[in-house]
From Swiss-Prot:
Gene symbol of the encoding locus: gadW
InterPro entries: Homeodomain-like_sf, HTH_AraC, HTH_AraC-typ_CS, Tscrpt_reg_AraC-type_HTH
SUPFAM superfamilies named in the record: Homeodomain-like
SMART domains per record: HTH_ARAC
Cellular component aspect of the GO annotation: cytosol
Residue stretches in coiled coil: none
Domain HTH araC/xylS-type intervals: 139-236
PROSITE patterns (UniProt xref): HTH_ARAC_FAMILY_1, HTH_ARAC_FAMILY_2
Keyword check for Repressor: yes
GO molecular function, one term: DNA-binding transcription factor activity
Name of the protein in question: HTH-type transcriptional regulator GadW
PANTHER family associated with the record: HTH-TYPE TRANSCRIPTIONAL REGULATOR GADX
Lineage of the species this protein comes from: Bacteria, Pseudomonadati, Pseudomonadota, Gammaproteobacteria, Enterobacterales
Length: 242
């Protein structure tokens, strides 16, 4: 999967020009840029180190955000964030780890990438930047729903948050061979599966967390989607059903 953004570690101070402004980058600061901007700058390898982050990692980061930010529209133009004083020893260790052949665990790599993104979590522009880096409309819709699975979602809610029209979203989703109702159902069923695998949450609570006011309707929907009831699913090891 292609990368959608990059984290840059500055190794010596220098200036860049962005949107008709000069920006002074200090030694040991880090930047987060969208893919196109990172490619446009073509930083010198003597001045910087670069870590490219894939879209799946961005989606995993956003999936753990449970509070829907207000500034989350396509109107946001932020493409560059700077952390002038990150925990440099940790940052350096993370960058070094990707050159260490002993670090070959996909799970560990994922956690290191997420750690890099979290170093910009104090920036209110982080979520819009990551959200806008998602390449598909269906991916954006899925991420919006994931912020609050229990919400009674309508297409107009998505259009409002993406600062566009319902008809345009419908058309783009059709171009991607999907639709809003399919994405909503898949998101709810994915959440239901994860909660059932915990085996510690009452069924009516799982139904509510997945946006269903009726437990019986949730059970029927789950059975139609996975081919088994929630009870049958919870009796098997995680990953048995697809």
């Amino acid at each position: 999967m292609a990368h959608v953004c990059s984290v840059i570690l500055v190794r010596r101070s220098f200036d860049i020009h962005h949107e008709q402004q000069k920006i002074s980058l200090h030694n040991e600061s880090i930047l987060l840029l969208d893919k196109n901007l990172a490619d446009d700058f073509a930083f010198c390898s003597l001045d910087t180190r670069r870590l490219d982050i894939e879209e799946l990692t961005v989606c995993h980061y956003l999936q753990n955000i449970r509070q829907l930010p207000r500034n989350l529209g396509l109107h946001s133009k932020d493409r560059l964030l700077i952390n002038q004083s990150p925990p440099i020893q940790l940052v350096t260790a993370i960058f070094d780890s990707f050159n260490d052949p002993r670090v070959n665990s996909p799970i560990l790599s994922k956690m290191l990438y997420l750690s890099c993104l979290s170093m910009f979590s104090h920036k209110k522009e982080l979520i819009p930047l990551l959200f806008n880096s998602i390449s598909t409309v269906s991916g954006k819709v899925e991420r919006l729903i994931s912020f609050d699975i229990a919400k009674r979602w309508y297409l107009r809610d998505i259009a409002e948050r993406m600062y566009t029209s319902e008809s345009l979203i419908k058309k783009k989703l059709q171009d991607e061979n999907t639709c809003f109702s399919k994405i909503l159902l898949a998101s709810r069923m994915s959440m239901a599966r994860r909660l059932l695998e915990l085996r510690q949450i009452p069924l009516h609570t799982i139904a509510e967390k997945c946006g269903y006011s009726s437990t019986s309707y949730f059970i029927n929907t789950f059975r139609q989607y996975y081919g088994v009831t929630p009870h049958q699913f919870s009796q098997h090891s995680p990953g048995t059903f697809s």
